[in-house]
Amino acid sequence: MSPNSRPGRPTVALIKWAAADGISEAIGLELAGLGYDVIPFQHDQPVPAAATVLTFAPHGRWWPVALQVGRLPAGDRPALIHWGTEGFPDPRTPWPLIAGLGRARSWLDALSDRPAAWQRRLARLPPVPALNRGLFRFRYVGDNLRAMRRGWLTGLADVSEWYARLYRKNGYPAQFVPWGTAPTWHADLKLERDIDVLWMGKRRNGRRSDLIDRVRRELAQHGVNMYMADGVERPFIFGEERTRLLNRTKLTLNVKTRWFNSGFTFRFHTVAGNRCVVVSEPFLPHVSRYQAGEHYAEAPPEELAQRILYLLAHDDERRALAERAYQLVTTEMTLRESVRKLIALPVPA
């Protein structure tokens, strides 16, 4: 138990994927606001004693955390709740292949945690290290399936309705818990919106990079500049600097890396609380509550620049979109509400 825990208050051990993990800190603040004593722990360190262990992402190896919980006597195990935020393999892949590859990838990753020395040596022999450097999304699924089968993972949620439904369809009781907006991610700074269009984040792959450049060229032909915070032209933006920049920005571009990508969710909840409008290409209905034309602007890839130009020329429409999105993410789809749903996931008897 944390030395700062107070008697009678439920305890939650909350994972941190880095020494400075802003997402974990935001979730921890919401848990504290809901009346929980929060015990942060690094993902590669011992899991502290608590009534509940809460993990998310993952941004590294998750299996050792589940293994620590699983090695405890059944009567002493905490509830282990995991909130998937890192996506899924291509959903066109047949489920038996997703599950089979996922379990195999998870098993390979877990070799280094085995008690037998020969198994740990096997983890260092080719081609195991090379295999462990790929197929991450399969590993995420495989870890979840193996931990649920063993009874260690008592609550599984995903930020995508689509992915949660895939789990349930195949016999795994995953729940949809949407991402939410934290109060520390937005402010009304009443600044002049002197930036027309913003791109923030990594380009990641050729598909996304090419489309960003295309939209940028087409806007430039009409005298509109795109502010680039891509880690190349300008540094990535975080915290107060990001909030300030979003308060100066009218529109933020969203471009997928893959056709099934769910990244819009995180961009939307970062942007909308600052009354900045997201302009996006179409994406899968990961969260049905988001409505194109109601909370964000949408256009096919080849029409994104034209949609941006239209909104810049019709300021009343842009402001109305911004206000509806702001109300959604600050009153209904907050991080507090998401964490409340997450921590209340049913624990099997």
Regions found by a protein language model. Give the residues of each.
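Short, hydrophobic/aromatic alpha-helical segments in well-folded domains
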Residues: 152, 267, 307, 324-325
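C-terminal "capping" alpha-helix adjacent to the active site of nucleotide-linked donor transferases
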Residues: 300-317
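Nucleotide-sugar donor-binding catalytic core of glycosyltransferases
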Residues: 2-51, 55-76, 82-269, 273-292, ...
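A charged, aromatic-enriched C-terminal amphipathic alpha-helix characteristic of glycosyltransferases
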Residues: 312-346
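Short, flexible helix/strand-to-coil boundary loops that buttress conserved ligand/catalytic motifs
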Residues: 290, 308, 322
